[in-house]
Design a protein with these regions (language model features):
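Beta-propeller blade-edge and WD-like acidic-aromatic loop motif
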Residues: 102, 108-128, 150-165, 184, ...
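Conserved beta-propeller blade repeats
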Residues: 93-96, 132-150, 168-188, 218-238, ...
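Extended, charge-rich low-complexity interaction segments
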Residues: 17-18
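Membrane-interface helical sensory segment of bacterial ECF anti-sigma factor regulators
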Residues: 1-5, 9, 21, 33-108, ...
Length: 373
């Protein structure tokens, strides 16, 4: 197995905004329902949202005294809006502002010799256990209801763990990343005895079926999926040569399988997309005697920028964008420490904030979710 599978660098996920209609004491609050049939909110997320610092959702409009009249008014408004839309074209409502939600991360649990998943507010408060150990290469679904593991899915409360068939045409299927709509997974496929099958495969997230091959490494190495683009058209991944623990950054077209190298001669350990799809962020490979760093680059390889963590760090890796695109979350070991905590900083490397402080624990798999309201 490659080093990628050993350290499980793939916790990527994003929440989708949802809301539920409510009727309380005969009053109707008009709300927008973005996702039908939403899953029950897990206890850890409810605890994070109940904090006084959390943003309070506001109802739209004044409560009406009669539910019947309220429903008639709502129906009339919908008819009027539809009529205007038919005569003047589509109506575009202003997009709701993106609010940064909880940061999720993995923490190594020595007693289990494996990983447990935690969530914490962006200010470092309210840490909650999400899934106890053992869990391998977890990655949260876009709707926040499930976590992909190797190779399967489990609900965020730990129930209904489904393990999928983990082989396909000779390839063992391992760590994965979600498509933006939550329907598909991009999965690493590998076979140390037959490296011709090494590459990335796509599979249904519901049952692991409908498997198709996306990439072929072709150099006896491994293709490791990092992140799916927000528009669902591309998968960013790390391509490593045989026997190497690092690789170069690539992007593959989901429809055609065509892949291009983003940055020649720049090797990395992890790659992810910004939420607007305009940038890739990657960990530059660790080189003995040199400080680690992050890079920002356009998906076509242009506008390459280097971001340096604080000068006193031992090593840093796993950067991921905040939902609003203004900050990066990552794991970093400071000074002579060999165990990492979670930090955030602005995308220019300034305003570094320590989120966790656990000197005896190693933390990784950093992911930053959208506030789900």
């Amino acid at each position: 197995m490659t080093a990628y599978r050993d350290v499980d660098l793939f916790l990527r996920a994003h929440f989708e905004t949802t809301a539920d209609p409510s009727v309380l004491d005969g009053q109707i609050d008009t709300v927008l329902t973005a996702t039908a049939g939403r899953r029950q909110q897990p206890a850890w997320l409810a605890a994070l949202r109940s904090h006084p610092m959390s943003t309070t959702a506001r109802s739209l409009g004044r409560p009406l005294s009669s539910p019947a009249w309220a429903l008639l008014i709502i129906l009339a408004l919908l008819v009027a809006i539809t009529a205007v839309g038919l005569t003047t074209g589509a109506i575009r409502l202003p997009a709701a502002p993106i609010v940064n939600g909880p940061i999720l991360f993995g923490r190594f649990v020595p007693a289990a010799d494996d990983t447990a998943v935690f969530a914490v507010r962006p200010d470092g408060s309210g840490e909650q256990l999400v899934i106890p150990a053992p869990i391998e290469c977890p990655q949260l679904s876009p709707d926040g209801g499930r976590i992909a593991v190797a190779f399967g899915v489990v609900n965020v409360d730990g129930t209904d763990r489904l393990m999928f068939p983990d082989t396909f045409q000779g390839a063992t299927l391992g760590c994965s990343t979600w498509s933006p709509d939550g329907r598909r997974l991009a999965v690493e496929g590998f076979n140390d005895a037959d490296r011709t099958v090494n590459g990335i495969y796509l599979a249904d997230a519901e049952d692991g079926g409908n498997v198709v091959r996306l990439t072929t490494n072709g150099q006896d190495g491994n293709d490791v999926p990092g992140d799916w683009s927000p528009d669902g058209r591309h998968v960013a991944f790390v391509r490593a040569l045989a026997g190497q623990e690092i690789g170069t950054i690539w992007v593959a077209d989901v429809d055609t399988g065509a892949a291009h190298q983003v940055i020649p001669n720049v090797v990395g350990l992890w790659v992810g997309w910004s939420t607007d799809g305009q940038w890739l962020v990657a960990s530059r490979a660790l080189v003995p005697g040199q400080a680690s760093s992050f890079i920002l680059v356009r998906p076509d390889g242009t506008d390459l920028r280097t971001i340096s963590p604080p000068a006193n760090h031992n090593w840093a890796t796993g950067p991921t964008f905040s939902p609003d695109g203004t900050r990066l979350a990552f794991n970093m070991a400071v000074g002579t420490a060999d165990k990492a905590d979670i930090y955030t900083m602005r995308i220019d490397g300034s305003d570094v904030v320590q989120i966790t402080n656990t000197p005896n624990d190693n933390e990784y798999f950093v992911d930053w979710g959208i506030d789900p309201r």
